[in-house]
Structure formats: C-alpha cells, structure tokens
Amino acid sequence: VVLVLVAVAIGAELYTRHLASSKVASAVQCEIQDSASVSFAPSPPVLWQYLNSHYTDISVQTAGNQVRSAKGMKVNLDIRDIKLSDTSNSRGTIGSLNGTITWSADGIKQSIQDAVPVLGKFVTGEVTTNPGDGTVQLKGLLDSATVKPQIVNNGLSLQVVSLSALGSKMSTTSVQQHLDELTSKATQNYPLGIHADSVKVTSTGVEATFSTSNATIPADSGGSTGGSQDTCFSNV
C-alpha cells in the first residue's frame, strides 16, 4: 500500500510539473516566438504549489533562435512569487520577473540583413563588438556604421554613432529609423510591464537586462489572437 501511495504521489508530481511547465513555456513561446524550456525550484513540490495556486520560483530559457523578428536573441527569465487567482480582468499576480536578453554578433548581422534589407550592405562583412567603448561596428564592402546599444522607450535601441556610406544616399536619420523599427519590434511593448533596465556590449554581442515587479497577469480577452499581452499569458 505504501509503495502504491508513493507511486501515485510521484506520478501526480510529474504530471503536474509537466502541465505547469507546458503552460509557462507556451506563454513565453507565444510572446517571444521561440521555443522555451522551463524548470522549477527543487522545493516545495510543484504539486503542492499547484494545489495552492502559488509558484515560488520558475526559470525559463529560450532556444536562442530569435526574439520576435530579431535573430540570434536568447532570453533567460527568473520568475518569482506567482499567485494565481481568477477575477474578471486578472489571472493573478507575479511578484517579480528578472530577465536577460543576449544578442549575438552574428544574430545582429542576420537580423539587419533579414529584417532591414535596405541596410544589408552595411553588414556584408563582420560585426565587431567593442566592450571598451560600448559600441558595435557594422562593416560592409564600402559602407560601415558604428552603433551604440542604449535603452530607449523601455526597450533596446541601436543608436547610430557614425556612418560611412560611400556612394550611398542614405543618411544617419534614415539608418536610425530602420534600426529603431527592428529593435522596437523585438524588445518593446512586452506584457506585464516588462521593461529594459540596462544594456552592455560584450565580447560576443549585446546583453540587456529586463524586469517587472508586482505585475498583474491579464485575463483572456476572448477575441484577440497570439502575440498580445491579453492572450499569451492568459492561460497560465
């Protein structure tokens, strides 16, 4: 009898862990548009957290393929103190969410080539990161641009520092507009009040931190479709 009870408890724990992981992963995948893996703190058991509608610590890691339209972006999240309680306009609350987005140099190159074709000539060569002065250099056959990652409108932005467009009519303003369109789509307007806190250039790319606290999980709006804060997290 004891063995049966133990087996049932283990089975219930594994099932609940799988169910909870699937829901969190689906919400993140919906918003980020990349696959995600989820893990829970070793204690208390996920079954206990499920029965109490209170999850203490959840970690999420995306595959690193992309964040929305930005290629080569990877997200790591630490989500704490999730309390689920249905009301007419809320599924519950999140005590805190802290995340890191890493954007590889190759990802920056591919993103600009794919999402902003008119700027493709600026990155036909290599993308070089310079942690010392916090800049990224985009090199083409004749053209080049130096950009500096900054926080703008609660998201990540690549601000043009210098531009060398030999034989081109493109201006700094035009290049900046195209870069802003790329980065704003990828890193702005996140749900739950998630916003960028800091950004730095590393030897391999760009790293930005994001966070939110005391956030309300929105209820299902009933009519909208994926990619909005009303639907991606409403089924958590």
Positions of the model-derived regions?
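N-terminal beta-strand/beta-hairpin edge segment
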Residues: S35-V118, F122, V127, P131-T135
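Hydrophobic membrane-targeting and insertion signals
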Residues: V1-Y50, D220-V236
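Solvent-exposed coil/turn segments that connect beta secondary-structure elements
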Residues: S43, A63-N65, R80-I82, L141-D143, ...
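Soluble extracytoplasmic domains of inner/organellar membrane proteins
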Residues: T102-Q176, D180-S184
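A short, surface-exposed beta-strand/turn
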Residues: V75-S85, P149-N154, G223-V236
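Short secondary-structure junctions
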Residues: V28-A36, V116-K121, Q188-I194
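Extracytoplasmic/luminal low-complexity segments enriched in Pro/Gly and acidic/polar residues
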Residues: T173-V236
